[in-house]
Design a protein with these regions (language model features):
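N-terminal secretory signal peptides
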Residues: 1-7, 18-25, 32-34
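C-terminal domain-boundary segment and adjacent tail
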Residues: 42-46, 188-206, 231-232, 241, ...
Length: 429
């Protein structure tokens, strides 16, 4: 990756904004927008410990009998090289690479990785194993949703303990002496490459957080979900609305949006219906400007800084262009999000629909409480009489979910509230 591309990506994750301001750019880039005061976030969380910056080609060893590794100076997220891992294409023969450590305390931390996948569809899973000389280890899902690596460019992936896949034996997390990265090929796949550019630990948050969000601005947000949440003692949520859908049958009106914000404390945020990956840069900008103009004109400057990707789809152009319009982009990729998020432009979620069960909610909330991650529950419609669509959640079921959230005792915050309170994790040099 050329130096200017690396710097662009680094500035991206640090919130750097390089384009000239316009009436629809982020409030901090213009003097005409007046966002309400935000609480001052704490100092950025520094890495607890850098485990490997990939600059020593001898530090990592191939521990599996399959696949191969080599230092690669043609692409890197940091320094002058990365570690290239080539898979076998056989799901029964994963490729594992090991890093020996002198003994690192990982009892209370999160993990910070920079990864690049040649083709994410060729990979079933990427697992991080933390252990010692034997086979005892904590096994984590680095990317529970492999779409996180869809762009083929360098991605920052932060991992919370809530992404635990298995505990083998009795690993000593107070003295980890071996880190293993295991890449499992997808079934019927071809050999493919994965690059590892950086690995570190990060401090854990003081508390887990739950957010409730709704996509598309359906009037069930106002008529059904809001009342259920209030009855459960949950104050507010985030509604991601589409400008040209507001006021249509089945969608919230401008008056209802105003009441949701001014009376009930909800945040009204940005969404769209067009697949942005089908557009050129001018088209992407038009979509962003349309929804930001609508939200700013109707008095929602804080929500206007947060965008939910239509159908969860994005590419490098969408990510790059979004920097000048938003503070966060929300995906539909299912994974526990770290606090603070490592990449605010790829926020991961707990995507909920008619298929979601109470046991899944219970498990997600228990892990959120124990491991202090961000559990961001995303819904579409909450219906008294569901129509069978996967995005339609029965009101009785939603009520049980909200009672589970309330009973957990976890703080519930809107997306702008979470993002205001969390300083971005600095991108390592």
């Amino acid at each position: 990756m050329p130096q200017h591309d690396r710097m662009r990506r680094r500035n991206f994750l640090m919130g750097g904004l390089a384009l000239a301001a316009s009436s629809t750019l982020l409030p901090e880039l213009q003097s005409t927008a007046h966002a309400s005061p935000a609480p001052v976030a704490g100092p950025p969380a520094a890495p607890s410990q850098v485990l490997s910056d990939m600059q020593d080609p001898r530090a990592w060893t191939l521990s599996s009998g399959d696949g191969s590794i080599r230092p690669d100076t043609s692409t890197h997220s940091h320094g002058t090289q990365s570690l290239e891992v080539t898979t076998t294409g056989d799901s029964r023969r994963p490729t594992s690479v090991d890093l020996a450590l002198s003994g690192v305390d990982m009892t209370d931390c999160q993990w910070d990785l920079w990864l690049r996948a040649e083709d994410y569809r060729q990979i079933e899973s990427i697992q991080l194993e933390l252990g010692g000389e034997g086979e005892d280890c904590l096994r984590l899902d680095v990317a529970p949703d492999m779409r996180t690596l869809r762009t083929g460019s360098w991605c920052r992936v932060t991992v919370n303990r809530a992404a635990e896949r298995a505990v083998v034996g009795h690993p000593r997390l107070d003295r980890v002496t071996r880190v293993r990265l295991k890449t499992v090929p997808a079934s019927d796949s071809a050999p493919s490459r994965l690059w590892l550019g950086y690995l570190a630990t990060l401090p854990s948050a003081d508390s887990g957080i739950v957010s409730i969000s709704f996509d598309d601005g359906y009037d069930s947000d106002y008529k059904t979900a809001r009342e259920i949440m209030q009855d459960c003692g949950i104050r507010a949520a985030t509604s991601y609305v589409i400008a040209d859908k507001v006021g249509l049958p089945g969608r919230m009106s401008t008056d209802q949006l105003a009441e949701m914000r001014e009376v009930h404390g909800w945040d009204i945020a940005a969404h769209a219906s067009t697949d942005l990956t089908t557009l050129d840069e001018a088209g992407v900008r038009q979509e962003f400007e349309t929804i930001r103009s609508f939200l700013l004109e109707h008095g929602y400057p804080e929500g206007a800084a947060h965008f939910a990707l239509p159908m969860g789809r994005y590419n490098d152009l969408v990510l790059r262009t979004s920097q000048s319009y938003f503070s966060s982009l929300r995906t539909i990729e299912n994974a526990p999000e770290t606090l603070a998020p490592g990449d605010p432009f790829r926020l991961r979620v707990f995507y909920c629909g008619s298929y979601t069960t109470e046991s899944q909610v219970e498990r997600a909330l228990a892990r959120c409480q124990e491991y202090r991650c961000w559990t961001h529950m995303v819904f579409h419609r909450v219906d008294e009489e569901p129509d069978g669509a996967p995005e339609s959640v029965k009101a009785d079921t939603f009520e049980r979910f909200m009672k589970q959230v309330a009973d957990s005792g976890l703080p519930v915050k809107t997306v702008p509230e979470v993002m205001r309170s969390q300083s971005p994790v600095p991108a390592p040099e």
